[in-house]
Amino acid sequence: MNAQAVAAALSAWGRLKRALFLALGLMFVFVLWRSERFIVDHSHPDWAYYAPVLWWLVPHGLGGLIALVTGPFQFSSRFRQRHLSWHRVMGRCYLAGIAVAVPFSVYLSLTHATLAFRFFLLTLAGAWLFTTAVAFVAVLKGHVQIHRQWMVRSYAITTTFVTTRVLTAIPSIGGGGEVIYVPAQWSLLVATMVLAELGLTWRALFAGVRPSMQNQSR
């Protein structure tokens, strides 16, 4: 594979990454309007259901929001190279957001979800905490590449904060009852993690080729 092909592949990956973050942003706006409006609009049908656990739900939501917003900056090589100190600050904010969101999500899962959905939510919370903890330990030990790989896995799970709500907005899924939407969310989680692994493989393959191509051109 020549240097031009490698450069084209990396450029395509950069464009795809920007497109994914744009799509995520649009989905987030949709979710705010459709699923979270009850927080300020108490006439919304969901208000009566969530009002008893509002003060558990808000910290969970804010923690997830912090992770969701700060995450994309962690994957920008340009931002990391130009603003390393800010990269680290935002990384700490990302960790803090998840550290807040996970305990509240566990409580909400145990008290406000059916058994089948509870198992999914607890698995999601455990995977979110585990992937983030591995990324954190890796960077503390100086294993930057491993840190980046696990951050991708962690952020993939973070995106389910949005994508699962978009999924249940589909009438045939959200209105189909637990027997439909719980398997659908499991499928979405698996697909999300598979896509994350494919992205890691793509990036590692061409990032690994690029230095050798540069050496050959000298």
Region locations from a protein language model:
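Alpha-helical membrane insertion/targeting regions
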Residues: 1-218
